[in-house]
Amino acid sequence: MSSSGAPSRKTLSKIATNRLQKELVEWQMNPPTGFKHKVTDNLQRWIIEVIGAPGTLYANDTYQLQVDFPEHYPMESPQVIFLHPAPLHPHIYSNGHICLDILYDSWSPAMTVSSICISILSMLSSSTEKQRPTDNDRYVKNCKNGRSPKETRWWFHDDKV
C-alpha cells in the first residue's frame, strides 16, 4: 500500500512548503521519541517509522506511517495511513486507515507532524487488546479504488480500547 489512497498531487503552496521545511528542521533537531523520518527527496510525502513504546502491547513492534501533505497544509490536515502491515488495533483498519479525530474533524493548523505522531503513539500505547475494528471487513471493502480516509465520515465514539 505505498500510494493507495494518495490525495491528488498538487504542488504545495509557498506557506505549506515553508511550514514543512521548518517542521523537518525541528524534527531533525528534536525527533519525537519512538519515531524515525525516512529521508527522501519528496517534501510532500513523508515515511515515518513508528516503534512501539516499552511496556505496551506494541513494545518494540515497528510500523511505517505514510504522511501525504495537501497543497494547503497546515490549513488542511495531511492524510496519514499505516503502510502494510498495519498494527492490529481497534481504531486501525487493515488497509492502514486510522480512526483518530485529530486527523479529520479535530485538525488544527497549530498541529505538527510531531504532534500527530505523539497522538498515534499514545493511541497505540493505551490499547488493551490487539484486534481490528469490528467493521474492518465492511469498511475495507467499501474503500476499494484507493479511497482516501479523508473521504470517510468517521464516527468518533470510543476512546477507551
UniProtKB/Swiss-Prot annotation:
It comes from Arabidopsis thaliana. Accepts the ubiquitin from the E1 complex and catalyzes its covalent attachment to other proteins. Keywords: ATP-binding, Nucleotide-binding, Transferase, Ubl conjugation pathway. Residues 15-161 form the UBC core domain. SMART domains: UBCc (SM00212). It catalyses: S-ubiquitinyl-[E1 ubiquitin-activating enzyme]-L-cysteine + [E2 ubiquitin-conjugating enzyme]-L-cysteine = [E1 ubiquitin-activating enzyme]-L-cysteine + S-ubiquitinyl-[E2 ubiquitin-conjugating enzyme]-L-cysteine. The keyword Transferase applies. InterPro entries: Ub_conjugating_enzyme, UBQ-conjugat_E2_core, UBQ-conjugating_AS, UBQ-conjugating_enzyme/RWD. PROSITE patterns: UBC_1, UBC_2. The active site is at 99 (glycyl thioester intermediate). GO terms for molecular function: ATP binding; ubiquitin conjugating enzyme activity. Signal peptide: none annotated. This is Probable ubiquitin-conjugating enzyme E2 16. It is an enzyme of class 2 (transferase). One of its GO terms (biological process) is protein ubiquitination. The gene is UBC16.
